[in-house]
Amino acid sequence: MQPNDITFFQRFQDDILAGRKTITIRDESESHFKTGDVLRVGRFEDDGYFCTIEVTATSTVTLDTLTEKHAEQENMTLTELIKVIADIYPGQTQFYVIEFKCL
């Protein structure tokens, strides 16, 4: 069985598959992805594979520079996005945006 390259919380699976979630915001430990990378995607909870994505762009962002566009690409409000990122990465402020499309 081939390992997954990146995982997402299961609650995001439907939005990813439907194309409503087109970015992910990660910390430095996942800053190595590059435009053009093709990644196997699994669920964080059980590592079960559910799709393959292609990285279409990467950039950096801080909590203070998150925008409504980031929130739209995450399929949530800006307030929700800031809370989710702060909950997942407490105490961190520098992040890496990975834009992607499902293949």
UniProtKB/Swiss-Prot annotation:
Keyword Hydrolase (UniProt): yes
Q: What class of enzyme is it?
A: hydrolase
Query: Record's CDD domains?
Result: ASCH_yqfb_like (cd06552)
User: Catalysed reaction per UniProt?
Assistant: N(4)-acetylcytidine + H2O = cytidine + acetate + H(+); N(4)-acetyl-2'-deoxycytidine + H2O = 2'-deoxycytidine + acetate + H(+); N(4)-acetylcytosine + H2O = cytosine + acetate + H(+)
Name a GO CC annotation attached to this entry: cytosol
Where is the catalytic site? Answer: K21, T24, E74
Pfam families per the UniProt record, alphabetical: ASCH (PF04266)
> Does Hydrolase count among this protein's keywords?
yes
Task: Name the Enzyme Commission number(s) assigned to this protein.
Answer: 3.5.1.135
Query: Which keywords has UniProt assigned to this entry?
Result: Hydrolase
Q: What InterPro entries does this protein map onto?
A: AC4CH (IPR008314), ASCH_domain (IPR007374), PUA-like_sf (IPR015947)
**HAMAP family the record matches:** ac4C_amidohydr
PANTHER family per UniProt? UCP029143 FAMILY PROTEIN
Q: What does this protein do?
A: Catalyzes the hydrolysis of N(4)-acetylcytidine (ac4C).
Name the family: Belongs to the N(4)-acetylcytidine amidohydrolase family.
Question: What is the name of the protein in this document?
Answer: N(4)-acetylcytidine amidohydrolase
Organism listed in the record: Escherichia coli O139:H28 (strain E24377A / ETEC)
Kindly list the organism's lineage: Bacteria, Pseudomonadati, Pseudomonadota, Gammaproteobacteria, Enterobacterales
